[in-house]
């Protein structure tokens, strides 16, 4: 019975020690003057209770120590587009680098968002894909990127349509050139044919003239023969009279 009591007493001491140890760990990881969410000021005043509860329980992979956070939190872009990134992928990074990486991503988000807002329809596809990759990476760290990705997707779709139209125009232009070449060739052949027809017409006209001349010559010869025959008959009559 004494051994059982001793064992239970030791068990209670171990549990109490574990709780105290865990309490010390919690104080080390989450000091009393540290807010779990390093970007809590990014949330809009009208955030719903669910978002507030989520932010309150968020545990980041680093302690917000840099005074630069206040500068970033007061930037217009984060007031206009509130953000609550969790930076959970940074748990895989070296601890000393985590906060710096997070600050870098804050700057990156501000920069790429500004670029997206200033995009024109003539933006190169390469730039759109680069921005898309940047926002996709930021999304992994908890940034809300639905709006910029949607704009990029629309511009990419527009670019895709433009490329298709350009391809269609290229095909159409080639077909137009082919048809124009055929038309030019047909015009040349038609011109050659007209020239030959004109030559034939001129030849026919010449032959018709020759025919008319021969017809006239034939008639003149016939008339002459008739006159000669008539004269021969007259001479025959005169000869008979003389006899």
From Swiss-Prot:
Q: Which UniProt keywords apply?
A: Coiled coil, Growth regulation, Nucleus, Transport
- Deletion phenotype: No visible phenotype under normal growth conditions.
Q: Where is the composition biased (Basic and acidic residues)?
A: 1-24
Instruction: State the coiled-coil residue ranges.
Output: 174-223
**Tissue specificity annotation:** Expressed in leaves, flowers and siliques.
Single GO molecular function: protein homodimerization activity
Record's keyword annotation contains Coiled coil: yes
- Signal peptide annotation: none
Subcellular location field:
Nucleus
Outline the extent of the DUF724 domain.
Answer: 59-243
Q: Where is this region: Disordered?
A: 1-51
- In its keyword annotation, does this UniProt entry include Nucleus? yes
A single GO CC term for this protein reads:
chloroplast stroma
Q: What does this protein do?
A: May be involved in the polar growth of plant cells via transportation of RNAs.
Query: What subunit structure does UniProt give?
Result: Homodimer.
Q: What is this protein called?
A: DUF724 domain-containing protein 5
